[in-house]
């Protein structure tokens, strides 16, 4: 039986890191320890909040909320000191990101909730993820993915208690030099693709162990998920369920883009600016909060992933090389990021977003025709 990560180990690491943090006098080392401490606290937060309490109903909810509140109070100050970075933004970049989001949001406004039919256990998810990364046959990615997936003590499985809960997260420990993967189990095919996606973030961590995670780190996760969809479809594995998952992904980002744009367009009214009904980019830039900037960049990351998948499908060696270049890239928050050298300039991304919008509409049209 596999020895997966458990809550006792998280708490033991947290106590050790907390002691290190209190004793440390070196500012650089203090930041490294601080990020690792946050990673373990967030992992504990995630693991406890979702899977530790066996009590259900209102009492279980109250216990969860109390545990989260207490833990938040304990590390809120530390979290605030370290998490100060935000994506670079100027008028031109904001205008570009909003255009990109508009295309993605135009895909289809209807929310889609997938119903995955076949059951899937942990062993099947682990084996499937290993087979996929071995199939990739990349000398930089495949061995690291195998290393991550073989270290089961750093993989945490939590029971899903709410259908609205997200699927997984990865936390980075710079003291123990390890990524911790947490999977919210649905006991179906989603667990496999969540594991593949989170493992990709672990690979990026080993390629470039950077304290300040850039806003584009999830590109590699989206790329691996898309490649995995194609791999398992080609092998005639759960094709109907995979088709549902792909529709779900389209739906999620269409909704995400719509929600982001709605919040952005409501900002001038909230700030009592004059141009409430027709805000310009300059006015939005003055009031847009850090989280909405991150949301816009996340949409760009999703479009970039689609572009890299197309590159890999056309020329596997070149496409994977571009992906690895991105994974190792130093992306500054002091200037606008430039992805021309990996074939993802602004014009390319806008064209990709338009194509995604049209494909999304066609997918939904065919889906509803089948249901009639």
Regions found by a protein language model. Give the residues of each.
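N-terminal helix-rich structural modules
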Residues: 1-92
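C-terminal, non-catalytic "cap/extension" segments appended to globular domains
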Residues: 13, 72-83, 105, 271-372
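Contiguous, non-catalytic segments that form substrate-binding/exosite surfaces or channel walls
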Residues: 50-179
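Inter-helical turn/loop segments and adjacent helix faces that build the functional surface
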Residues: 77-84, 139, 143, 206-211, ...
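Glycine- and acidic
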Residues: 111-118, 176-188, 205-214, 284-290
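Active-site recognition of the HExxH zinc-binding catalytic motif
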Residues: 183-209, 218-221, 226
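Post-HExxH zinc-binding segment in Zn-dependent metallohydrolases
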Residues: 208-256, 301, 342
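Acidic/His/Gly-enriched intrinsically disordered linker/tail segments
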Residues: 230-291, 324-328
């Amino acid at each position: 039986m596999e020895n997966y990560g458990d809550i006792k180990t998280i708490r033991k690491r947290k106590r050790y890191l907390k002691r290190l943090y209190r004793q440390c006098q070196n500012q650089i080392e203090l930041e490294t320890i601080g990020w690792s401490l946050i990673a373990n606290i967030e992992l504990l937060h995630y693991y406890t909040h979702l899977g530790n309490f066996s009590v259900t109903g209102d009492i279980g909810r109250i216990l969860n909320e109390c545990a989260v509140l207490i833990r938040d109070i304990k590390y809120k100050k530390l979290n605030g000191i370290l998490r100060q970075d935000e994506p670079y933004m100027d008028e031109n970049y904001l205008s570009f990101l909003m255009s990109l989001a508009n295309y993605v949001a135009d895909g289809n406004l209807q929310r889609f909730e997938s119903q995955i039919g076949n059951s899937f256990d942990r062993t099947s998810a682990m084996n499937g993820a290993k087979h996929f990364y071995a199939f990739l046959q990349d000398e930089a990615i495949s061995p690291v993915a195998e290393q991550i997936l073989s270290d089961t003590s750093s993989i945490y499985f939590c029971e899903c208690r709410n259908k609205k809960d997200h699927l997984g997260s990865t936390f980075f420990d710079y003291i123990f030099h390890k990524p911790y993967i947490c999977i919210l189990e649905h006991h179906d095919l989603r667990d496999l693709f969540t594991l593949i996606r989170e493992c990709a973030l672990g690979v990026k961590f080993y390629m470039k162990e950077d304290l300040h995670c850039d806003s584009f780190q999830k590109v590699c996760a989206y790329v691996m998920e898309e490649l995995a969809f194609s791999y398992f479809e080609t092998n005639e594995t759960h094709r109907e369920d995979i088709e549902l998952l792909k529709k779900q992904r389209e739906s999620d980002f269409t909704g995400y883009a719509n929600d982001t744009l709605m919040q952005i367009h409501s900002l001038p009214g909230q700030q009592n600016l004059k141009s409430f009904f027709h805000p310009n980019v300059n006015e939005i830039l003055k009031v847009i909060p850090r989280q909405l900037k991150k949301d816009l960049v996340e949409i760009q990351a999703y479009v970039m992933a689609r572009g890299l998948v197309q590159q890999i499908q056309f020329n596997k060696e070149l496409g994977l090389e571009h992906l690895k270049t991105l994974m190792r890239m130093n992306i500054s928050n002091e200037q606008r990021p430039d992805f021309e050298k990996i074939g993802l300039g602004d014009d390319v991304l806008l064209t990709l977003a338009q194509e995604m919008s049209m494909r999304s509409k066609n997918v939904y049209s065919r889906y509803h025709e089948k249901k009639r």
